[in-house]
């Protein structure tokens, strides 16, 4: 089966073993934050498509917090975070002006 990952060897040095333990925790935390980011962005996009400007602006404020957290932790580059916030901000503002 091609989908099975090859088993990794256990590190010999104590520092390597510690690093492996930390990697598991960090991977779980990063995956969780990345998922929270995707959900926040999707919720704002849905609100914009639905035309609900109050909900869109409320969700956008929460999304900004999530994006800033992810950029601060280095999961995404700060420029990507700024770009995503800018694009969604433009959509929310366009919705407010249209209505």
From Swiss-Prot:
Biased composition, class Basic residues, residue ranges: 1-20
Record GO biological process: translation
Residue ranges the record marks as coiled coil: none
Superkingdom, taxonomy of origin: Bacteria
Keyword Ribonucleoprotein: yes
SUPFAM superfamilies: Ribosomal protein S20 (SSF46992)
Single GO molecular function: structural constituent of ribosome
Gene: rpsT
Classification of source organism: Bacteria, Pseudomonadati, Pseudomonadota, Betaproteobacteria, Burkholderiales
Cited HAMAP family: Ribosomal_bS20
Any one GO cellular component localisation term in the record: cytosol
UniProt function note: Binds directly to 16S ribosomal RNA.
One family name in Pfam for this protein: Ribosomal_S20p
Protein name: Small ribosomal subunit protein bS20
Disulfide bonds: none
UniProt xrefs under InterPro entries: Ribosomal_bS20, Ribosomal_bS20_sf
UniProt keyword annotation of Plastid present: no
Region (Disordered): 1-29
Family: Belongs to the bacterial ribosomal protein bS20 family.
Keywords of the record: Ribonucleoprotein, Ribosomal protein, RNA-binding, rRNA-binding
NCBIfam families xrefs: S20 (TIGR00029)
């Amino acid at each position: 089966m091609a989908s099975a990952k090859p088993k990794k060897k256990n590190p010999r040095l104590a520092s390597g073993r510690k690093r492996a333990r930390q990697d598991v925790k960090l991977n779980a935390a990063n995956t969780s934050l990345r998922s929270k980011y995707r959900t926040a962005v999707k919720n704002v996009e849905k609100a914009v498509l639905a035309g609900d400007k109050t909900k869109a602006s409320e969700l956008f404020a929460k999304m900004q917090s999530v994006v800033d957290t992810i950029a601060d932790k280095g999961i995404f580059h700060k420029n990507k975070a700024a770009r995503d916030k800018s694009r969604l901000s433009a959509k929310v503002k366009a919705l407010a002006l249209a209505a």
